[in-house]
Amino acid sequence: MKKWFPAFLFLSLSGGNDALAGWHNVMFYAFNDYLTTNAGNVKVIDQPQLYIPWNTGSATATYYSCSGPEFASGVYFQEYLAWMVVPKHVYTNEGFNIFLDVQSKYGWSMENENDKDFYFFVNGYEWDTWTNNGARICFYPGNMKQLNNKFNDLVFRVLLPVDLPKGHYNFPVRYIRGIQHHYYDLWQDHYKMPYDQIKQLPATNTLMLSFDNVGGCQPSTQVLNIDHGSIVIDRANGNIASQTLSIYCDVPVSVKISLLRNTPPIYNNNKFSVGLGNGWDSIISLDGVEQSEEILRWYTAGSKTVKIESRLYGEEGKRKPGELSGSMTMVLSFP
């Protein structure tokens, strides 16, 4: 005779992986460097080198996030991530802009390369360091730590604007340099601070780059006003006005002229044009060709000119009388 025993299954479900989730205590310790580099006399075609070293020393906590205990109880793990976050371009107080191009990152992992404004360099070490004690494992901003690990320097090329005026310059390169110290309770439960969070940390390190620009190119003016004047609307379509810009260079160089519209056009006619309002566009030409880019070359010191021409365009039924205005930006750069 068989006897049946009732069987009961109890199942408890929780959202996500909460049952397996561990805790994380994360601190960021920042260095506070002030370095100077004097590149001497340079020309805009030169690309002086910029070294950002990794020096050991005392660092101060500038960030913390602790989801775990303040003091350990039993086994826990540790890991470290060295961070360098360096701007891709730097402005002076006068509004001039230089770009930093990576020349050497040996020993570093360069990550999040699509960021428009910053380079991110990471170096991890002492992964999953096993520890069993009752030490303090959550520290607040202001706590100081001696950091003695050594890493390779970062080397950059400094790209100068082709139209940088002659004179002495000081470019402050402010960057983030520090260590992310991570405590956690589950083996291999690694954590890296998000890039958007890292780049918001205080840039406590400065490298002051100084140099004297002794050669380059200068446009004859910073503003050109192409004025069509007062026109009868029936005769406005196709009206042409122009201005000529002179550029003087005293170094052998190729200069790319690029036009960028500030006011979008009304019509899509596959030409570079600028919107003027009231149903009108301005179709732009450079040296008689409907284009938005041109390259000029200098082999000896001297001036060259570029003619910027505006041709009014408006379609029947859309164009209206009134004041017309629009703008564009001309950029001088190396090809």
From Swiss-Prot:
> What does the entry give for GO biological process?
cell adhesion
Q: Which residues form the signal peptide?
A: 1-21
Q: Name one GO cellular component term.
A: extracellular region
Give the coiled coil ranges.
Answer: none
InterPro entries reported in the protein's UniProt record: Adhesion_dom_fimbrial_sf (IPR036937), Adhesion_dom_sf (IPR008966), PapG_carb-bd_N (IPR005310), PapG_carbohydrate-bd_sf (IPR038420), PapG_chaper-bd_C (IPR005309)
Major place of localization? secreted
- Subcellular localization(s) per the UniProt record: Secreted; Fimbrium
Q: What is the effect of changing residue 334 to S?
A: Decreased dependence on chaperone PapD for release into periplasm
Output the PTM entry: Contains disulfide bonds.
What are the GO MF terms of this UniProt record? carbohydrate binding
Oligomeric and partner information: Interacts with chaperone PapD. Assembly of the P pilus requires periplasmic chaperone PapD, in absence of the chaperone overexpression of this subunit is toxic, where the protein accumulates in the periplasm. PapD stimulates release of PapG from an inner membrane-associated form (where at least 1 disulfide bond can form) into the periplasm and also helps it achieve its correct digalactoside-binding conformation.
Homology family: Belongs to the adhesin PapG family.
What is this protein's function? Tip adhesin component of type P pili that binds preferentially to host cell glycosphingolipids such as globotriaosylceramide.
| Protein name stated in the entry | Fimbrial adhesin PapGI
Naturally occurring in which organism (per UniProt): Escherichia coli
Q: Which gene encodes it?
A: papGI
